[in-house]
């Protein structure tokens, strides 16, 4: 195989083929995908765009940057650390070697926590956001027509032209109002409870292979107040910041023992526009938590890999911070600490939501029960593995629902 040199002419197609072979020789599991992801980052394009640029030649600067990326990946450095970012749900998060790389299965934790507050799925929220935006655009169009009409009539001295303009304005306003009605807005403020969406009456079809969408708990009743969220072991902040984006009436506290991780989470809070609703605390779980702090939701994806297993993990996973992986002899050390203190910091009616390791679901559920919480669901991930445990601090409002779930 020829070496990648800056003197040779390298097209997109040629360099992808070369890198795929090179990565295959290094034992990487997805050599072509890795090559495409790295090249896209260098060129600033999407993967699909590569197929339209196969004959494009790389500049010396692009080739130099790509070559450095390839060498790092060949040494099994995770892709996200090389590019410096990772997609989680619909947002890009900065990541560094100081934080665990966000993973797809963790998105389910966010989805279920959102349902706990809203009673709605992420799909429903996205649909409502779409129509809300359409309604706002329609309202702006109506206002623009009215403003333009007033200005025009004020300057118009010819009565016939004024009448003609009034008719044109009426026609424009009618068109704008029709658009507003289609967006769920007629007059006045939009009624969010009646926002329409495509196929509202259609039965939701669950793709094969996805986990059961049985809800983990009925919606929390916050009586119009702010929803308070605590994320223990926040890392990049992916869980908490996604929740803040999806729940505008919420605020959150991100806790991590690592100051480097908290720095990354703070950057991401600013990038996602939720820095005004996010606070950060360097603490070993509860050690520096104010005694009176109370939350509606406590979420955590703590270290859960048994210490003796870490050396057997994929080489790129071993590049992630040990602090975010090592869960002690049985992988449950962090869960014991979190559950031991959560009763004093979760409001009645509140939710505790955990991501867990393989085979840990029932053990973590038992730890929750020991603290007086009612386990409402152990949810499987996309691979059919028990991956999340949800527990509520019961009160009379939920007692009937909980009994029904336990039958």
Regions found by a protein language model. Name each.
Residues 1-43, 50, 55-58:
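Non-catalytic accessory regions of SAM-dependent methyltransferases
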Residues 39-120:
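Conserved AdoMet
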Residues 108-143, 164, 178-187, 192, ...:
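Conserved SAM/SAH cofactor-binding pocket of Class I
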Residues 146-165:
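Charged, low-complexity interaction regions
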Residues 149, 172-179:
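Generic L/I/V-rich hydrophobic alpha-helical segments across diverse proteins
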Residues 167, 404-406:
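Cationic, low-complexity basic patches in intrinsically disordered or flexible, solvent-exposed regions
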Residues 236-396, 401:
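S-adenosylmethionine
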């Amino acid at each position: 195989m020829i070496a990648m040199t800056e003197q040779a002419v390298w097209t997109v197609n040629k360099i992808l083929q070369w890198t795929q072979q090179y990565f295959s020789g290094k034992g990487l599991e997805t050599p072509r995908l890795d090559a495409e992801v790295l090249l896209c980052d260098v060129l600033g394009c999407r993967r699909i765009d590569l197929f339209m640029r196969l004959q494009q030649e790389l500049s010396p600067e692009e080739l130099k940057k790509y070559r450095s990326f390839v060498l790092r990946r060949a040494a099994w450095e995770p892709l996200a650390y090389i590019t410096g970012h990772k997609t989680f749900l619909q947002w890009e998060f900065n990541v560094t070697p100081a934080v665990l790389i966000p993973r797809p299965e963790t998105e389910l934790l966010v989805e279920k926590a959102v349902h706990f507050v809203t009673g709605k799925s992420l799909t429903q929220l996205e649909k409502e956001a779409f129509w809300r935006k359409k309604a706002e655009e329609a309202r702006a169009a109506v206002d623009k027509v009215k403003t333009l009409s007033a200005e025009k009539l004020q300057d118009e001295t010819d009565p016939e032209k004024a009448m003609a303009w009034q008719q044109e304005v009426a026609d424009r306003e009618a068109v704008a109002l029709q658009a507003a009605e289609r967006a769920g807005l007629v007059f006045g403020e939009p009624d969010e409870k009646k926002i329409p969406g495509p196929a509202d009456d259609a039965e939701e079809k669950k793709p094969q292979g996805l986990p059961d969408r049985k809800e983990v708990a009925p919606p929390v009743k916050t009586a119009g107040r702010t929803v308070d969220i605590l994320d223990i072991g926040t890392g990049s902040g992916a869980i908490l910041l996604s929740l803040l984006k999806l729940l505008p009436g919420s605020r959150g506290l991100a806790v991590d023992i690592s100051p480097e991780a908290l720095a990354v989470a703070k950057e991401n809070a600013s990038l996602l526009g939720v820095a005004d609703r996010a606070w950060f605390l360097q603490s070993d779980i509860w050690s520096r938590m104010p005694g009176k702090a109370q939350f509606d939701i406590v979420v955590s994806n703590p270290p859960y890999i048994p210490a003796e297993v870490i050396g057997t993990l994929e080489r790129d996973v071993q590049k992630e911070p040990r602090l975010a992986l090592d869960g002690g002899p049985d992988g449950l050390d962090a869960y014991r600490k979190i559950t031991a203190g959560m009763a004093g910091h979760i409001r009645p009616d509140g939710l505790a939501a955990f991501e867990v390791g393989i085979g840990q679901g029932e053990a973590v559920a038992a730890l929750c029960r020991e603290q007086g919480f009612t386990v409402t669901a152990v949810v499987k991930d996309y691979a059919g593995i028990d991956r999340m445990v949800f527990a509520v601090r019961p009160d009379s409002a939920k007692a009937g629902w909980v009994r029904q779930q336990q039958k």
